[in-house]
Amino acid sequence: MEMNALNAALLVNLIGFTVGVALYGLVAAMVVRHRSRSKPASVDLLLLTTAGLGLLWNLGELYSFIQKDFALGGISPWLAAISFSALGFLPSVVVHSAQADDEGTHWLTYAAYTLSLLAAGLHFYSAAAGNAVPSDLALQAQTIGAVALASGLLLFNLKQTLEKKTIWASALLVFAVSALHLSGDREGNSWLIELIAHQASLPLALTILYQNYRFAFADLFLKRAISLILLSLTAFGLYVAVAAPLLRYHETHDRDDASAAA
């Protein structure tokens, strides 16, 4: 049973990161294709940056899981530092996007990017010093920072509706939960925990899309994204409902045959 749980968790991560690569790639392609119909260039650049960060995170983690499964050891600490630094900058672009239309000094945006830079520095310092990457201190700092930024968006973005502020804050809180999990023991968790903890980058991208491209652009993206997600959920459901029980049955049957022969 434990082995099947680990297989399910591994499958969740592989599917999740593959879907993440596809969705962020789709975001980048659609921004470039529909750039003349969207908002000003600064917003396009922000969404392209989001897509680039999401691709770095998901590609890095996908490669890491494949490397651990098919080869000896993990990935280079420098590659891990790049991957986790990209994840750490995603909350910053969320805050940036949330304050893009506000007048005045965007102190929360500056604070978010400062925190992301600090976390990235800690990841690369850990890699250079030969310590474990990601840096637990960096992830813990970003957990606290994400909660503080979510509170700041709720309190200080006075011009935005409560619905918008709640969506921004919820995306940041999902990231906070993910960072808190990643800063602790990451081995032997259930597939549900792995789903919540490792796939926090997807709600961040969907939040930015929903807020900035609510109409045709978001609808076009969501039609493709939902089809891809449903296909992935179907594959995972078939594994849990069909493949895993069959594998467990065959393992038990083989052990019984071996015992009878002995």
Where do the language-model regions lie?
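Membrane-interface helix-boundary motifs at transmembrane edges
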Residues: 32-47, 99-108, 155-167, 215-222
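Interfacial "cap-and-anchor" motif at the non-cytosolic start of specific transmembrane alpha-helices
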Residues: 160-262
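Individual alpha-helical transmembrane segments in multi-pass integral membrane proteins
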Residues: 7-26, 39-151, 171-172, 191-202
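Membrane-helix interface segments in multi-pass membrane proteins
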Residues: 1-2, 204
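Short, Lys/Arg-rich N-terminal segment immediately upstream of the first membrane anchor
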Residues: 2-10, 220
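Juxtamembrane "helix-exit" motif on the non-cytosolic side of transmembrane helices
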Residues: 2, 33-35, 60-72, 122-133, ...
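Alpha-helical transmembrane segments
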Residues: 25-32, 61, 150-157, 205-213, ...
